C-alpha cells in the first residue's frame, strides 16, 4: 500500500510538472462569447493570469471581485486575465460574466469537467489559476486575494 501511494505521488508529480512553475504554459485556443477563437499565446509580452472558473462555482464567484481589483490596478502596466470557464450552460456563463463585471478575455468550450483544456492543465477543482510571465513561463499557481495583489505589486513596482 505504501509503495502504491508513493507510485501515485510520482505519477501526479510527473503529470503536474508539465504545468508546474518554470514550465512553458501549454497553448489554449478557445472561443469567446462572440465565437471568436482567442489563443493564450496572443498575450505573449504581458503577464497573464490564466484563471479556471465557472458561473456555478461559488468560491470562483467570491474570488472574482479580487480579480476585478487586480485587473483595474495592473492592466495598464501589462497585466491581462485569460479566464477559462468550465460552465456547460452558455446562459449561466454569460450571466456570471455580466453580473461580476468581468471585462477581460473570457473563453470556454462549454464542456464542463470534460474540457480537454481542464485535463491539459490537470484541473481537479476550481478556482485554479496560473500566473504566466511575458515569455510564456508559469511563474506562480493558485494566487488568490491578497497573495495575487502582493505578487503583482512585486512584479510591477
Map each language-model feature to its residues.
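Conserved redox-active cysteine motifs that mediate thiol-disulfide chemistry
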Residues: 44-45, 52-69
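Short, internal strand/loop/helix patches
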Residues: 26, 31, 94-135
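Thiol-/selenol-based redox modules, centered on thioredoxin-like
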Residues: 133-157
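N-proximal helix/coil linker or "cap" segments that precede and/or mark the start of modular domains
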Residues: 1-31, 41, 46, 72, ...
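Short beta-strand segments
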Residues: 51, 82-85, 107
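Alpha/beta-hydrolase fold active-site loops
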Residues: 47-48, 127
